[in-house]
Amino acid sequence: MFGKSTYPALEELQESLSSEQLRILKDQVESEGQDPAPQSQFNYAWGLIKSSNYKMQQQGISILSELYRDVPSMRRECLYYLALGSYKIGDYSNATRYADTLLKNEPENKQAQDLKKSIHEKVTQEGLIGIGIAGGALAVGVGILGALLRKKR
């Protein structure tokens, strides 16, 4: 899904943690019982987002959303990783929203600026691919319609 990125911030998304590393993060959260430390939850969410498994990525985003809501001191970090996670799963609308919120508070944040540029490039690229597919489908449809009309004559 991700080629070599020109943005260092996105390169960290390309490498998943090993299942053993992810297990260590999960075990840490579970060992803390009913009320795990926010940092432990954040670390686990980060590991989940780096995963290549879509459901795990969504779980990581969900954990970060809860942390963002419940732990004001972690909002900055949560916003950034919510943007990264949303980007990774292809939810560019939310990725943009999170990056914009971060940039509203920190307009000079280079990582957030790079992420926003990358989101824009990805949306543009996927839009062009979509236009190409739609154009191809239209051409096929016109060709079939033309053939049918000639056949009726």
Curated annotation (Swiss-Prot):
Cellular compartments per GO CC: mitochondrial outer membrane; peroxisomal membrane
This protein's record includes keyword Mitochondrion: yes
Coiled coil, from the record: none
Mitochondrial intermembrane topological domain: 149-153
Swiss-Prot/TrEMBL GO biological process terms: autophagy of mitochondrion; mitochondrial fission; peroxisome fission
Disulfide bridge map: none
Database matches in SUPFAM superfamilies: TPR-like (SSF48452)
Compartments where found: Mitochondrion outer membrane
Key words of the record: Membrane, Mitochondrion, Mitochondrion outer membrane, Repeat, TPR repeat, Transmembrane, Transmembrane helix
Annotated InterPro entries: Fis1, Fis1_cytosol, Fis1_TPR_C, Fis1_TPR_N, TPR-like_helical_dom_sf
Record-stated family: Belongs to the FIS1 family.
Function: Has a role in mitochondrial fission. Has a role in outer membrane fission but not matrix separation.
Protein name: Mitochondrial fission 1 protein
Organism: Debaryomyces hansenii (strain ATCC 36239 / CBS 767 / BCRC 21394 / JCM 1990 / NBRC 0083 / IGC 2968) (Yeast)
